[in-house]
């Protein structure tokens, strides 16, 4: 039809594999269809988008179940991302009234986190260029998990109890607050 209308043919056409409900193809006749509107009503559009990008690759069949959706949202969005945001805001407000300055009292663990944060956007973008959204999200969530681990390793709540460690505390909080304000974080979260 395009040729008959003298319209150029597409250079690239994206197709997708089957969307499965558990192990079976979704089918109205089987009664195992999960409707996107129902998912959005319950979980919200962003959580559903995240799930679809993470669990349903372009090059393989993707499976969706209510249990899998709840598990992914709880493990990644609530436990990893939500926990990190909550910890960051709570400690920044509690120890520095929400204004954290870099006192530059650095240790090796700080540089490791910074290096990971700087490398992550390039890795995530490369995965997106390969149409591997799930792998791009894995790169982002690896950084978020590492940041949660960084908080556990640096123990800001212990540093806060020692007035002589106040500058180190400020550096630690600054490092994980920086992830949300840097150009690198801005680019990666846009991915």
Which residues make up each language-model segment?
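N-terminal low-complexity segments that are often proline-rich with Ser/Thr-Pro
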Residues: 189-191
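Short acidic/His/Gly/Ser-rich catalytic and metal-binding motifs that mark active-site loops
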Residues: 22, 59-61, 81, 149-153, ...
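Secondary-structure capping and boundary motifs in well-ordered enzyme cores
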Residues: 28, 39-41, 69-80, 105, ...
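Conserved small/polar residues in nucleotide/adenosyl-binding loops
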Residues: 180-187
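Generic alpha-helical structural context detector
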Residues: 41, 49-53, 83-86, 90-93
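Alpha-helical recognition segments enriched in aromatics with Gly/Pro capping
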Residues: 1-67
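Conserved, charged catalytic cores of large soluble enzymes
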Residues: 85-124, 144, 148-165, 169
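Short, charged/polar, low-complexity loop and linker segments
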Residues: 61-66, 119-126
């Amino acid at each position: 039809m395009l040729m008959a209308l003298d319209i150029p043919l597409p250079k690239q056409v994206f197709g997708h594999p089957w969307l499965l409900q558990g192990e079976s193809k979704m089918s109205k006749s089987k009664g195992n269809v999960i409707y996107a509107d129902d998912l959005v009503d319950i979980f919200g559009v962003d959580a559903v988008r995240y799930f679809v990008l993470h669990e349903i690759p372009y090059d393989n069949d993707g499976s969706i179940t209510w249990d899998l959706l709840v598990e992914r949202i709880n493990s990644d969005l609530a436990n990893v991302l939500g926990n990190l945001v909550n910890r960051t805001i709570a400690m920044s407000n509690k120890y520095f009234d929400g204004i954290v300055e870099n006192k530059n009292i650095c240790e090796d663990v700080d540089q490791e986190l910074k290096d990971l944060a700087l490398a992550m956007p390039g890795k995530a973008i490369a995965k997106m260029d390969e149409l591997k959204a799930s792998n791009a999200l894995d790169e982002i969530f690896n950084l978020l998990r590492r940041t949660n681990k960084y908080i556990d390793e640096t123990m800001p709540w212990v540093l806060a109890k020692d007035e002589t460690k106040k500058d180190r505390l400020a550096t630690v909080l600054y490092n994980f607050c920086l992830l949300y304000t840097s150009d690198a974080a801005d680019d990666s979260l846009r991915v």
